[in-house]
Amino acid sequence: MDVEILTMKTTGDKILDRTLDKIGGKGLFVKELDRALLEGRSQLSVHSLKDMPMEVPEKLPILAFSKREDVRDVLVLPKGCDVLDPLKPIGCSSLRRKLQLKEIYPDMQVKSIRGNLQTRLEKLDSGEYSALVLAAAGLKRLGLENRISRYFDTEEMIPAAGQGILAVQGIDGLDYEFLKGYDDLQAHQAATAERAFVKYLNGGCTSPVAAYGEIKDGQLKLTGLYYEEKTGHYLKGYKTGNPSDAEKLGTSLAKELQERCKVEYKESGLQEDNKKEPGKVWLVGAGPGDVGLFTMKGAQVLEQADVVVYDSLVGQGILTRIPASAKLINVGKTCWPPYYVPGED
């Protein structure tokens, strides 16, 4: 079979100065490839399944799933280092990882990082970060397994739905008989359960929902993480069922965790406490942007903030103190006249 490879750079690859939840989510990695299929410029697209939206166009179905590679997330340290530097943040690109890292390394700061794998490793080795959290599969595919310092167990760091699986997408109505031998049944069933779990909870780039399915002894065990954005409460849980009922299993676990989260949150008394305790707004001066001149009180309120509004005068060292769960709002003011805020015009 003769194959012509059409390489493409997506919008998600081009916009690197903002986190994915601020620029439109995972759909930014597939739009250009979808357009190429619809316009007849290509007949197949290959994606990392974890980067695909939960909803795919009816005319562009997922045709096959590859055999799953190593599903785990890993810790990568700078070259020549064997311990974490507590003064520098851990870099990772997903809210799912940030949330779970807070359990594993509660005293470490976590900071977003974008770019392809080589770009991220260069930033790490230049001293910007104490470590990175990445997918093991991506490092192994590029022959960089020697950079891995620690593997996270799938129970302490639940992977993203579809992690370690490549998905083949095509055009509805075309003959893809040749793909039958490529589609891996176990990966297909596990991914179906994982994506059903996330889809029911409306999860994606803007919510740290996670799911991992594993088939053993003829049974599919699905482990999931549900996060309630309004309350900040989250739960992990699992459910076992028949692999042939993968979609139902995913939806069922999602419903259970969602209901349990509501009950536990209510029983904890946090709901009542939130009603009684009004929120506070703190005005914190960032000075000339030098973290060394930041006040202790400013650092304290920043580390406990739920929402942080900042402009371009603030230094990156100050931003690393913001908790991973906080919502960031960049008003975009420039540091020279005329001052400008997005939306003014």
Kindly give the residue locations of the regions a language model identified.
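Short acidic active-site motifs
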Residues: 32-33, 119-120, 297
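Short, structured active-site "lid" loops
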Residues: 17-43
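N-terminal beta-loop-helix "entrance" segment that forms/cooperates
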Residues: 9-24, 316-328
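A conserved helix-loop-strand patch within extracytoplasmic ligand-binding domains
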Residues: 49-108
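Short, well-ordered alpha-helix to beta-strand connector turns
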Residues: 87-88, 105-108, 129, 302-306, ...
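Alpha-to-beta junction loops
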Residues: 38-47, 127-137, 308
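Class I S-adenosyl-L-methionine
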Residues: 275-289, 298-345
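Small-molecule-sensing regulatory modules
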Residues: 1-9, 14-16, 20-22, 98, ...
